[in-house]
Design a protein with these regions (language model features):
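Cationic, histidine-enriched alpha-helical/coil surfaces that engage anionic ligands
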Residues: 2-170
Length: 170
């Protein structure tokens, strides 16, 4: 049985018989399509995982762009900025959940260090923010819609990417 990790890693490889420019485009399309699928599939049960996976695909895509940056010329900056902006729109959601998880981990690591009055007010506020964030992204938030638009716009430009040079010099 092939695991997701094995499939994911295989997709991010340049095949021996593939031209570099074609491989870069293929990999970019795969990553952006997977990022879009994660956002389109968001619901209250998978919101945190979907945002995380979407941002991971964007990170891989931007890493790919950085690898070929010298060969992309002026096409690099607008492509990178488009995908960067899409990920940035999703970061407040990630931040709200990461802050709550970090708070919970810190309390679990040292329960004796919790003040006598407790930290219930702070914890409830963090839970409220995380819950509000989940409702926002699953309710068709403007940020998620804009991130989808940016990803789709970025995907449209991939086939126009030209790499200067040849082979590993590209």
């Amino acid at each position: 049985m092939t695991t997701y990790r094995e499939v994911s890693a295989a997709e991010y490889r340049i095949q021996a018989d593939e031209k570099l420019e074609a491989a870069v485009r293929r990999i970019a399309h795969e990553q952006v399509e997977q990022a879009i699928a994660q956002l389109r599939g968001i619901d209250t049960h998978n919101a945190q995982g979907s945002i995380h996976q979407c941002r991971k695909h964007i990170k891989k895509l931007r890493g790919l762009l950085r690898m070929v940056r010298p060969s992309m010329g002026r096409a690099y900056r607008p492509a990178n900025n488009t995908f960067r902006d899409a990920a940035r729109l999703l970061s407040p959601y990630r931040d709200a959940h990461a802050l709550l998880a970090t708070f919970d981990d810190a309390i679990a690591a040292d329960p004796e260090g919790v003040p006598a009055g407790g930290l219930g007010v702070a914890w409830r506020e963090l839970v409220r923010r995380a819950d509000d964030s989940t409702r926002s992204v699953t309710g068709g938030s403007a940020e998620v819609q804009r991130a989808l638009e940016l990803l789709e716009h970025g995907a449209e430009g991939i086939d126009g990417w030209k790499l200067k040079g040849s082979g590993w010099n590209a």
